[in-house]
Amino acid sequence: MLKPMYYEFFFIFPKERELFESFLLDATHLALEESSLENLKAFDDKETIGFISQSNWHYFATHDPLKKDLKENLKEKPPHLKNFVILRSQKDLNNSLIPALEAFCLNLKQNLQSEFDFFYLSRNLASKDWLEAYKQAILPVQCTKFYIHPSWHQKPSHVVTNDCIMIDPALAFGSGHHESTSMCLELLSDIDLKRKNALDVGCGSGILSIALKKQGVSALVACDTDSLAVEETLKNFSLNQIPLLVQDKVIYGSTQKIEGRFDVIVANLVADVIKSLYSEFVRLCNHTLILSGILETHLNSVLQIYYNGFEVLEQRQRNEWVALKLLKKQPIN
């Protein structure tokens, strides 16, 4: 009997990585894993290291839209392998996703008046082997007081239940391992949230909403424009045995559906979306706004937009990712 297969794709995006990642999320609704050779070495994954180092990477470029074998080129430019994105699917997406990604690349060239390219590899493996490898790779992480772990890892006896967040990172949503999520949790942990009302924009897995509830917010609203994210948030609320009170809401849709003002707003998104939401955050924020998911290269453009309405209280950076804690400027009478 043949084993069921799954497919693994590796992508390198030299420019505007977050735009390409957003496209992959929208196109597939599958998990994306940001990784590097250093991460693979840490997990002693010699098989994958050998595969990505020795395989012939496919290449697409808007200035020369013919795929090329760039094995030798990559050997001459090892920085390409420092950061890459992994996508796993039960279906072979070579004949659908890759052409769509090429078309997206050409659209970017037309819209942004710049050249773009990407590299990719794919392989297929036995599903059972992948599932076990996946579980071994998703380890618990300690982020401030929170111990974040998947359901197949038990919490240590010395960690109290209220400091645990159980997340099974099966979809493309926050699990606490990504720098932008961990910095959000750190910034939230520094705030007294008891009896505050809070808004989580782009709730994803619900990890930040769960942290807000565990820190004592009296009313919570979470929203996401992805229906799968709303389902995942509700599932993880149940998994963590956190009841949704009458004043709590999980909304499918954007901030336009939300009324009132909030003491604390957290938004772990991407820079372009954060910039587009400025006027909404001015309308909804009463005091503190936490923004994350900003690549360092986009930080100045975000700050230029938010300068008039908010004061920067704190800025954190981990690798290329930046998070901001902002204070709403009050109008002068």
UniProtKB/Swiss-Prot annotation:
Belongs to the methyltransferase superfamily. PrmA family. GO terms for cellular component: cytoplasm. It is found in: Cytoplasm. It comes from Helicobacter pylori (strain ATCC 700392 / 26695) (Campylobacter pylori). Pfam families: PrmA. This is Ribosomal protein L11 methyltransferase. GO terms for molecular function: protein methyltransferase activity; protein-lysine N-methyltransferase activity. Its main location: cytoplasm. S-adenosyl-L-methionine binds at T181, G202, D224, N268. Its EC number is 2.1.1.-.
